[in-house]
């Protein structure tokens, strides 16, 4: 169970770093807003799912 928790935690950290770089770039380019809007919504949903998964796994591991 600890390995699964560590995998999800690393995925959350790396995805958060990706979002920190990607979201401002997507907002700064108005010509691609229609293309990047669904990608931002999907990325935000994945990030929220990872946060909930890490919280649940943290409860189970500790």
UniProtKB/Swiss-Prot annotation:
Topology in the lipid bilayer: Multi-pass membrane protein
Transmembrane segments: 8-28, 41-61
Key words of the record: Membrane, Photosynthesis, Photosystem II, Reaction center, Thylakoid, Transmembrane, Transmembrane helix
Subcellular location: Cellular thylakoid membrane
One BP annotation, GO: photosystem II stabilization
UniProt entry tagged with the keyword Oxidoreductase: no
Keyword hit for Membrane: yes
Record's GO cellular component terms: photosystem II reaction center; plasma membrane-derived thylakoid membrane
Residues in the signal sequence: none
Its biological purpose: May control the interaction of photosystem II (PSII) cores with the light-harvesting antenna, regulates electron flow through the 2 photosystem reaction centers. PSII is a light-driven water plastoquinone oxidoreductase, using light energy to abstract electrons from H(2)O, generating a proton gradient subsequently used for ATP formation.
HAMAP family assigned: PSII_PsbZ
Family indicated by similarity: Belongs to the PsbZ family.
Oligomeric form and interacting partners: PSII is composed of 1 copy each of membrane proteins PsbA, PsbB, PsbC, PsbD, PsbE, PsbF, PsbH, PsbI, PsbJ, PsbK, PsbL, PsbM, PsbT, PsbX, PsbY, PsbZ, Psb30/Ycf12, peripheral proteins PsbO, CyanoQ (PsbQ), PsbU, PsbV and a large number of cofactors. It forms dimeric complexes.
Name of this chain's protein: Photosystem II reaction center protein Z
Gene: psbZ
């Amino acid at each position: 169970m600890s390995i699964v928790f560590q995998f999800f935690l690393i995925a959350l950290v790396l995805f958060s770093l990706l979002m920190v770089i990607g979201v401002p770039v997507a907002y700064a380019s108005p010509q691609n807003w229609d293309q990047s809007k669904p990608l931002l919504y999907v990325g935000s949903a994945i990030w929220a799912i990872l946060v909930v998964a890490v919280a649940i796994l943290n409860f189970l591991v500790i």
